[in-house]
Amino acid sequence: MGLPWYRVHTVVLNDPGRLLSVHIMHTALVSGWAGSMALYELAVFDPSDPVLDPMWRQGMFVIPFMTRLGITNSWGGWSITGGTVTNPGIWSYEGVAGAHIVFSGLCFLAAIWHWVYWDLEIFCDERTGKPSLDLPKIFGIHLFLSGVACFGFGAFHVTGLYGPGIWVSDPYGLTGKVQPVNPSWGAEGFDPFVPGGIASHHIAAGTLGILAGLFHLSVRPPQRLYKALRMGNIETVLSSSIAAVFFAAFVVAGTMWYGSATTPIELFGPTRYQWDQGYFQQEIYRRVNAGLAENLSLSESWSKIPDKLAFYDYIGNNPAKGGLFRAGSMDNGDGIAVGWLGHPVFRDKEGHELFVRRMPTFFETFPVVLVDGDGIVRADVPFRRAESKYSVEQVGVTVEFYGGELDGVSYNDPATVKKYARRAQLGEIFELDRATLKSDGVFRSSPRGWFTFGHASFALLFFFGHIWHGARTLFRDVFAGIDPDLDAQVEFGAFQKLGDPTTRRQVV
């Protein structure tokens, strides 16, 4: 049977045994990829600096997903939080990877078995003896089982009743750890940044799924509805399944890009909106002002800012700065962060404190402009020096560092001042090692950006797939030219025009 590549799946159209087989094989491939990818990432992952070289800077993709579900230790003796462990137990990163690979192998064998033994009694309609599936009943079974899994995850795993809990952090991604979470049953449970909503929503959705599954197992669909929605056609199942998948893909693309309790910034990196809104910058200034209010010096106040918080306030960690088609981790772009140089404070010769205007997300280059506390431009790095009025040299700008490696160091050399003004456009200033990985200096996106782009793209593709297969199953009779409810016996080939007795073919 010479089928074109886009129609090869018709070989399992009326073959329930082999339809099951290919789905088991698909599960084997997915699980095998997950386990293999985890082992690859563990082979290249450097856990030595969770503050300045976290998993998301290194381009880890599956490690963050394991971590958010409660895996923190490795058989290599390290912990994701930076400590060492002596007895990580079976559910370490390697243990989860191994479990996926073993499961993949079992699915592979099961797929082969079902391909060979495809003609099972369970797939035969006892009235006709032909292969058939009771699709509404199968729908009920799957709904019930997925409801049980959903309820179990929310009620046991997330709450810590039987399981580790999930990754929970503060709003600034500084104190994250795995801990049990109590369900949030009030309005706060609908806040996407409240972890308790994860538990309560899984419990509620799981309960609904169990009840809906029992309903579909015990109540048969009305005949009109059965016919209207083509419930006897396997392509209806394909269409509605694709709808469920693309809807889920759009949802998770949103929760990943805009941020939520399910996508902690410690595991996936900050969102672009945190840079756009100056989210971390505001918190840093709040902490510095609080230190000054306690009679600490400017240097002492800035020295109390955690490197982790300062590092979030750097444009190189903005997932929208990396191009969609630039391969590699963030570390392959601007380099591996080694240390925070400190916060630069610029002043002109009149004593005004100056603030460098920060680069917006979608700019590759941006003019260096320094403004005072009232937003008045006091200095800049001019494009045309002949017409300049506010150049660093003319205004006499100096820079002094507070906190970090250069704490207390000041510069009045214009070339050095301009160098740090340019770097201050990009947020807090860090020493970056570009030699180790031969980093090219071009920003890369984080796993947050890749996940969003991938899921949004496939969701769009699957949306069209849903429309395509939905139309095919709803209008099957129109496309085939045969009315599925045609009662009269039609002998194919007897008439020149199908079903028209006046056009009977002449026997030669």
Curated annotation (Swiss-Prot):
GO cellular component: chloroplast thylakoid membrane; photosystem II
Gene Ontology process terms (BP): photosynthetic electron transport in photosystem II
Membrane topology of the entry: Multi-pass membrane protein
Cofactor, how bound (note): Binds multiple chlorophylls. PSII binds additional chlorophylls, carotenoids and specific lipids.
Pfam families: PSII (PF00421)
InterPro entries: PS_antenna-like (IPR000932), PS_II_antenna-like_sf (IPR036001), PSII_PsbB (IPR017486)
One GO MF term: electron transporter, transferring electrons within the cyclic electron transport pathway of photosynthesis activity
Keyword set includes Manganese: no
Domain of life, per lineage: Eukaryota
Disulphides: none
SUBUNIT field: PSII is composed of 1 copy each of membrane proteins PsbA, PsbB, PsbC, PsbD, PsbE, PsbF, PsbH, PsbI, PsbJ, PsbK, PsbL, PsbM, PsbT, PsbX, PsbY, PsbZ, Psb30/Ycf12, at least 3 peripheral proteins of the oxygen-evolving complex and a large number of cofactors. It forms dimeric complexes.
Its job: One of the components of the core complex of photosystem II (PSII). It binds chlorophyll and helps catalyze the primary light-induced photochemical processes of PSII. PSII is a light-driven water:plastoquinone oxidoreductase, using light energy to abstract electrons from H(2)O, generating O(2) and a proton gradient subsequently used for ATP formation.
PANTHER family (alphabetical): PHOTOSYSTEM II CP43 REACTION CENTER PROTEIN (PTHR33180:SF37)
Protein name (database record): Photosystem II CP47 reaction center protein
Organism: Nymphaea alba (White water-lily)
